Amino acid sequence: MLLRGPYPNLHLQKELCGKAAYDLVLTITSSKEMLYDNIATSDTLVSGLGAYRPVIVEVGPGIVEGSMCVVDDPVGAPVKAGDIIQAGKNWSQVGSLADHLTGTPREMVSVFFKSVGCAARDLAACGVAMAGMIELG
């Protein structure tokens, strides 16, 4: 285990060779080489939070092509989401997080969530921070 914390059921570990079951695979790097690829399964949510430029890739084509891809910014993703760009996924098969959350739930499918950053979310966070500062005086 890499990290111990206040959550006894949360175990952070390096990827093991061979087959291993993970609930969540989370990548947050600026790697230019693929860090994780496996057969996509509905048991594991893969979330790519790095790779925000076309030349950066964390998650490989096995996951991207084998998963329902959901992005936080459907306008920015086609020019920023290196994992999806390099895998050659058809953009008509990539959905937005907003549509995914408000739509009808699908049967169990593998999901790859890709975040490239979203200025609207950043602006909302700034608004909350500013309101807190004003309240504190």
Could you describe each region identified by the protein language model?
Residues 54-137:
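Adenosine-phosphate binding glycine-rich loop
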Residues 7-84:
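Rossmann-like adenosine-cofactor binding region
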Residues 1-6:
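Phosphate/pyrophosphate-binding betaalpha-module
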